[in-house]
Curated annotation (Swiss-Prot):
Record's compositionally biased regions (Polar residues): 8-20, 463-473
Compositionally skewed regions (Low complexity) per UniProt: 153-164, 373-382, 415-440
Motif mapping: Nuclear localization signal: 172-201
Name under which the protein is recorded: TOX high mobility group box family member 2
PROSITE patterns in the record: HMG_BOX_2
Organism whose genome encodes this protein: Rattus norvegicus
Expressing tissues: Highly expressed in ovary, where it is restricted to undifferentiated granulosa cells. Expressed in hypothalamus, pituitary gland, testis and uterus.
């Protein structure tokens, strides 16, 4: 290999030097490739990606200097183009060959040097080169077909100035895939059909003009004379007759038209008045139906606390007697004569109640009088028997309730009841009368049960059995 001009190596010298080792010659510095012809400037975008790919894959920084002129690239490209498109202009074959050879020569002249593993690189570069040339050529052909200023027989490979690279790629895509380009003609847009309003048969008809009246009168006569005359012929004849008509006859037709117009206005006013008279009741009813929906029946509000306690058996007369400071004995008899509670109330009592009877006072009692505390109040009149707690349960309820300490008595001791009355409680029977106990209880002596006001302690949750009247001995 001669050292006179190492940068310019012929293709044959590069090809023949493959058998020699890499140590026989010096690798010249890489120089940028010569610029292609102006006709191939539009192909630079497509080839730049493939060249960079090939450069990145080359090992040890060595670039391929293989001769592509011995390959039959034009035949491959022509066969591919024929398979895709079906036909090719014969005048463009030399152009394709010139582009391929000039591109390969420019590529090889600036990149001499051997490379290991050339077959794989050769195959990849050939496929990339053929695809890029095919896409570019298809874009050129589609650009010529789409209103290109150059004549169809021209061999120039430059596209029209109005086309761009993106348009060429899109056109090539539509050509290769066989898809149709969507139509963008604004005149082909579907027009929305206008819906005609239905005319009311009761609406009065508009009056016609004077010429229309004359046309009606003369149309029948013309049709009788010329049965084969078309509507256009009849219109021409009527127009000529109207022009030749005298002014007085025209005024007669105009007066008829004015009279018909006045009648039409009167009929139209009456028709609109009838519409107005019919529409308000219907619209008013619809508005009333919307504004006043049927009222929903709301159930009566239930009381928050079901308290069938003292309020159920204290009548206004009893409260009035209580306010008027009646005798405690009469009040006790009234309370005892009424049914206290039909059963145990499970609902909580109201938070504040003026009368909250407390448990009977915890006073020291003799042993024989303990059983009388557990018995319910005696009934002075026939009344339904309320359910009564057994003695142990009543005792537990009394122990569970925290009685307030005995305070000052607001009422004197309640008078006793007759000793012959029996008890309705299943507890122990009344003890036998003894001479130690008097029949009456003066206000100064001790008593077994009292009624007092207790505003501080909450009322009991069970039926009030706190007003206890023991049977006297």
């Amino acid at each position: 290999m001669s050292d006179g001009n190492p940068e310019l190596l012929s293709t044959s010298q590069t090809y023949n030097s493959q058998g020699e080792s890499n140590e026989d010659y010096e690798i010249p510095p890489i120089t940028p490739p010569n610029l292609p012809e102006p006709s191939l400037l539009h192909l630079g975008d497509h080839e730049a990606g493939y060249h960079s790919l090939c450069h990145g894959l080359a090992p040890n920084g060595l670039l391929p200097a293989y001769s592509y002129q011995a390959m039959d690239l034009p035949a491959i490209m022509v066969s591919n183009m024929l398979a895709q498109d079906g036909h090719l202009l014969s005048g463009q074959l030399p152009t394709i060959q010139e582009m391929v050879h000039s591109e390969v020569a420019a590529y090889d002249s600036g990149r001499p040097g051997p490379l290991l593993g050339r077959p794989a690189m050769l195959a990849s570069h050939m496929s990339a080169l053929s695809q890029s040339q095919l896409i570019s050529q298809m874009g050129l052909r589609s650009g010529i077909a789409h209103s290109s200023p150059s004549p169809p027989g021209s061999k120039s490979a430059t596209p029209s100035p109005s086309s761009s690279t993106q348009e060429e790629e899109s056109d090539a895509h539509f050509k290769i895939s066989g898809e149709k380009r969507p139509s963008t003609d604004p005149g082909k847009k579907a027009k929305n059909p206008k819906k005609k309003k239905k005319k009311d048969p009761n609406e009065p008809q508009k009056p016609v003009s004077a010429y229309a009246l004359f046309f009606r009168d003369t149309q029948a006569a013309i049709k009788g004379q010329n049965p084969s005359a078309t509507f256009g012929d009849v219109s021409k004849i009527v127009a000529s007759m109207w022009d030749s008509l005298g002014e007085e006859q025209k005024q007669a037709y105009k007066r008829k038209t004015e009279a018909a117009k006045k009648e039409y206005l009167k009929a139209l006013a009456a028709y609109r008045a009838s519409l107005v008279s019919k529409s308000p009741p219907d619209q008013g009813e619809a508005k009333n139906a919307q504004a006043n929906p049927p009222a929903k029946m709301l159930p009566p509000k239930q009381p928050m606390y079901a308290m069938p306690g003292l309020a159920s058996f204290l009548t206004p007369s009893d409260l009035q007697a209580f306010r008027s400071a009646a005798s405690p004995a009469s009040l006790a008899r009234t309370l005892g004569s009424k049914a206290l509670l039909p059963g145990l109330s499970t609902s909580p009592p109201p938070p504040s109640f003026p009368l909250s009877p407390s448990l009977h006072q915890q006073l020291p009692l003799p042993p024989h009088a303990q059983g009388t505390l557990l018995s319910p109040p005696l009934s002075m009149s026939p009344a339904p028997q309320p359910p009564v707690l057994p003695a142990p349960m009543a005792l537990q309820v009394q122990l569970a309730m925290s009685p307030s300490p005995p305070g000052p008595q607001d009422f004197p001791h309640i008078s006793d009841f007759p000793s012959g009355s029996g008890s309705r409680s299943p507890g122990p029977s009344n003890p036998s009368s003894s001479g130690d106990w008097d029949g009456s209880y003066p206000s100064g002596e001790r008593g077994l049960g009292t009624c007092r006001l207790c505003r501080s302690s909450p009322p009991p949750t069970t039926s009030p059995k706190n007003l206890q009247e023991p049977s006297a001995r």
